[in-house]
């Protein structure tokens, strides 16, 4: 039985999630909630500067949009409690506005009749379970939680990388830097922002700023709590980022041993290893959470290791959102079947 999905928000992540979800036969996208007319949404789905022309035909219709004959209802209400999730039998709402990334706010979707909610960003509080595929998705608990967080794109990258290193060699401590493409949170031209560096034009500078990725990692990989810290460098590219991770390990290692650990990790679809000398644009629209740049792996003093991992911060992350939503839906179905017996 297909999982009924609704997407709240049609920004960068919302549109990428919709494109990907429509290729998943386990999911039935029934509705989107956005403040734009169907003509605008259809156009932005059909033509994307970063990820290219969509391979499906999206048309605006009176009730919303039609994608290759599949009709999706368009709603426009800024208050999630007013949305007809109960009437539409919505199993999972993918919350992609960024405005309800707190359990106490996201619960509005539950009050409207949705069974579960998946946040497309780290939770800012409340009763929310954070999930990173390849790290703790086997602990997804629909009996205890109604609201889930897919963490951030950077946590989805560093999570599997840190897990492999910690499981195989043990992490003593480390520092990470994400070299991150520009995002909607930055300014095209100098304008006020609570982070004075992010107030500066994103197209003109490398901008040092904060990231919560290393701190959030303890939520999904508690074994490394207190062992990792990090920062971000925002760079003037439109997409694709990387994590530069330097750790001290409990064991002495070689470059080959480190790269082999990633190659042999049971993380198909989540973590990949690239041996060619590629650059960021080559990873655009790559679906993995992390792609190890094997040529950049370094070892100093036998146990200090530097690893570079690429990630498409839009497409890779959105793939994980869809996969986690799919898993939540499957668990809902399994629970319903047990009750029916």
Swiss-Prot record:
Binding positions for NAD(+) per the UniProt entry: 12-13, 78, 120, 184, 313
Enzyme class, first EC level, given as a word: oxidoreductase
Swiss-Prot/TrEMBL catalytic activity: D-glyceraldehyde 3-phosphate + phosphate + NAD(+) = (2R)-3-phospho-glyceroyl phosphate + NADH + H(+)
GO molecular function: glyceraldehyde-3-phosphate dehydrogenase (NAD+) (phosphorylating) activity; NAD binding; NADP binding
InterPro entries named among the record's database cross-references: GlycerAld/Erythrose_P_DH, GlycerAld_3-P_DH_AS, GlycerAld_3-P_DH_cat, GlycerAld_3-P_DH_NAD(P)-bd, Glyceraldehyde-3-P_DH_1, NAD(P)-bd_dom_sf
Main location: cytoplasm
GO cellular component, one term: cytoplasm
Active site: 153
Entry's family note: Belongs to the glyceraldehyde-3-phosphate dehydrogenase family.
PANTHER family, A to Z: GLYCERALDEHYDE-3-PHOSPHATE DEHYDROGENASE 2
Protein known as: Glyceraldehyde-3-phosphate dehydrogenase 2
């Amino acid at each position: 039985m297909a999982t009924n999905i609704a997407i709240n928000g049609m920004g960068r992540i919302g549109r990428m999630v919709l494109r990907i979800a429509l290729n998943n036969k386990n999911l039935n996208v029934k509705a989107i909630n956005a403040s734009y007319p169907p003509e605008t949404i259809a156009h932005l789905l059909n033509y994307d500067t970063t990820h290219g022309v969509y391979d499906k035909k999206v048309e605006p219709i009176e009730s919303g949009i039609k994608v290759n004959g599949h009709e999706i209802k368009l709603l426009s209400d800024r208050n999630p409690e007013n949305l007809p999730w109960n009437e539409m039998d919505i199993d999972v709402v993918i919350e992609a506005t960024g405005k309800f990334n707190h359990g106490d706010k996201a619960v509005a979707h539950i009050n409207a009749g949705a069974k579960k909610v998946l946040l497309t960003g780290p939770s800012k509080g409340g009763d929310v379970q954070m999930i990173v595929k390849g790290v703790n998705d086997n602990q997804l608990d629909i009996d205890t939680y109604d609201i889930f967080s897919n963490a951030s794109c950077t946590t989805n990258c560093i999570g599997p990388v840190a897990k492999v290193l910690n499981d195989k060699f043990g992490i003593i401590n480390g520092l990470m830097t994400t070299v991150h493409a520009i995002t909607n949170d930055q300014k095209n031209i100098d304008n006020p922002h609570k982070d004075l560096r992010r107030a500066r034009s994103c197209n003109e500078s490398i901008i040092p700023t904060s990231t919560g990725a290393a701190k959030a990692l303890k939520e999904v990989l508690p074994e490394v709590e207190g062992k990792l810290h990090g920062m971000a460098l925002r760079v003037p590219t439109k997409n694709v980022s990387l994590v530069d991770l330097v750790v001290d390990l409990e064991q002495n290692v070689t470059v080959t041993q480190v790269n082999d650990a990633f190659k042999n990790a049971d993380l198909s679809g989540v973590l990949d290893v690239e041996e060619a000398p590629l650059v960021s644009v080559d990873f655009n629209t790559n679906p993995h959470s992390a792609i190890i740049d094997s040529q950049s792996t370094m070892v100093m003093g036998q146990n200090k290791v530097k690893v570079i991992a690429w990630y498409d911060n839009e497409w890779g992350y959105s793939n994980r959102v869809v996969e986690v939503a799919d898993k939540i839906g499957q668990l809902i179905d399994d629970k319903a079947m047990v009750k029916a017996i």
